């Protein structure tokens, strides 16, 4: 056979930018197909036509019978199979090398721009890389495919899987699984049915079964790689969608905190003046400062009726009543304030209105 080194060098480049299953597939292609085909299988089919014998001396009958028995030689059929199966990988390798070259050029441009900016002293905002150039990333020393390179790789696997299936089915339709030792030929110019004999049929059957098994293994690896990439992509999509849902469902500020702060049980009773009027109805139901933001925005100052509880605070704490007997009308006590003449304690000397006179 010809020299396989040229094809091997190209496939080594593909090996650098492949997944783990893809590297196993390339190993199977190198060792169990190309190596076996170039060393052992070629010697078994080297004397195929020369040792093909028929029971006739009719000129041309033997050649016609050989063409009927072997439309294409097994060894040449397998060479075509390897070429067609490897061609998608070569296309992927060309795309990968083009992407690497584009990334190198982009890095050189960025380095030149950084040098020019450093010389002029002007600050230059960093330019984000194009999405088409970031086609893989290294995680723990492993290359993880992404972007356009991943799409090309998936298309490569689909094409080579189709090729594998087509060649396996074609080999079965042409030859079956095993070669028969005796082949009966009924083609013209043979005057009658002629018996023809295949050389070393058992040895050839061993290689036929081996090559079909390797083709089946390659097909299984291609399907496994498709499943691996598809399942990985689905998990990434599901993970991103789940993260987006979690971000939208993040808990906001606790709105129920205000409702949980309940006033003491006697708080509403303290807000009644002497006439029995309430300054506000209920603490939990009337939050004036929270429920009237429009008044604050327009600059309007609410009165005591609008702001519940504020009159109570100003009456008892802000205003300081005068106790002088000669207080004028301008120094009246605030409405709702009533003095209590009861003694504050037993030791106090001040009189209370309800003390009994003796």
Swiss-Prot record:
Which parts of the chain does the record assign to the membrane side Extracellular?
A: 41-76, 186-205
Source domain of life is Eukaryota
Q: Key word DNA-binding present in the record? A: no
One Pfam family here: Connexin40_C
Localization annotation: Cell membrane; Cell junction, Gap junction
Q: How does it sit in the bilayer?
A: Multi-pass membrane protein
GO CC list: cell projection; connexin complex; gap junction; intercalated disc
Record GO biological process? angiogenesis; artery morphogenesis; atrial cardiac muscle cell to AV node cell communication by electrical coupling; atrial septum morphogenesis; atrial ventricular junction remodeling; AV node cell to bundle of His cell communication; AV node cell to bundle of His cell communication by electrical coupling; blood vessel development
Chain residue ranges for the region called Disordered: 242-262, 318-358
Membrane topology, Cytoplasmic segments: 1-19, 98-164, 227-358
The family annotation for this protein states: Belongs to the connexin family. Alpha-type (group II) subfamily.
Its function, per the record, reads: One gap junction consists of a cluster of closely packed pairs of transmembrane channels, the connexons, through which materials of low MW diffuse from one cell to a neighboring cell.
| Name of the featured protein | Gap junction alpha-5 protein
Q: What is the lineage of its organism?
A: Eukaryota, Metazoa, Chordata, Craniata, Vertebrata
């Amino acid at each position: 056979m010809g020299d396989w080194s040229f094809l091997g060098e190209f496939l080594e480049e593909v090996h650098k930018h492949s997944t783990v299953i893809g590297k196993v597939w390339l190993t199977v292609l190198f060792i169990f197909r190309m190596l076996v085909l170039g060393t052992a299988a070629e010697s078994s089919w080297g004397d195929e036509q020369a040792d093909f014998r028929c029971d006739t001396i009719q000129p041309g009958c033997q050649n016609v019978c050989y063409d009927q028995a072997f439309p294409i030689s097994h060894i040449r059929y397998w060479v075509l199979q390897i070429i067609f199966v490897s061609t998608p990988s070569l296309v992927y390798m060309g795309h990968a090398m083009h992407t690497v070259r584009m990334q190198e050029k982009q890095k050189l441009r960025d380095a030149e721009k950084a040098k020019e900016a450093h010389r002029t002293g002007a600050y230059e905002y960093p330019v984000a890389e194009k999405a088409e150039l970031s086609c893989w990333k290294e995680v723990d020393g492993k290359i993880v495919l992404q972007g356009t390179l991943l799409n090309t790789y998936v298309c490569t696997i689909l094409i080579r899987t189709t090729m594998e299936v087509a060649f396996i089915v074609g080999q079965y339709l042409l030859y079956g699984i095993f070669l028969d030792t005796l082949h009966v030929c009924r083609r013209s110019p043979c005057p009658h049915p002629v018996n023809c004999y295949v050389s070393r049929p058992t040895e050839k059957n061993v290689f036929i079964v081996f090559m079909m098994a390797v083709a089946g293994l390659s097909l299984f690896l291609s399907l496994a790689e498709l499943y691996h990439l598809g399942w990985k992509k689905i998990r990434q999509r599901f993970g991103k969608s789940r993260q987006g849902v979690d971000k939208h469902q993040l808990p906001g500020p606790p709105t129920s905190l205000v409702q949980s702060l309940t006033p003491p049980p006697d708080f509403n009773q303290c807000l009644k003046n002497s006439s029995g009027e309430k300054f506000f109805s209920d603490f939990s139901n009337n939050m004036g400062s929270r429920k009237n933001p429009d008044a604050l925005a327009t600059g309007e100052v609410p009165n005591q009726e609008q702001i519940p509880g504020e009159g109570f605070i100003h009456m008892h704490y802000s205003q300081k009543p005068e106790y002088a007997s000669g207080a004028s009308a301008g120094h009246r006590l605030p409405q709702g304030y009533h003095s209590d003449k009861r003694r504050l304690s037993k030791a106090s000397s001040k009189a209370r209105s309800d003390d009994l006179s003796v």
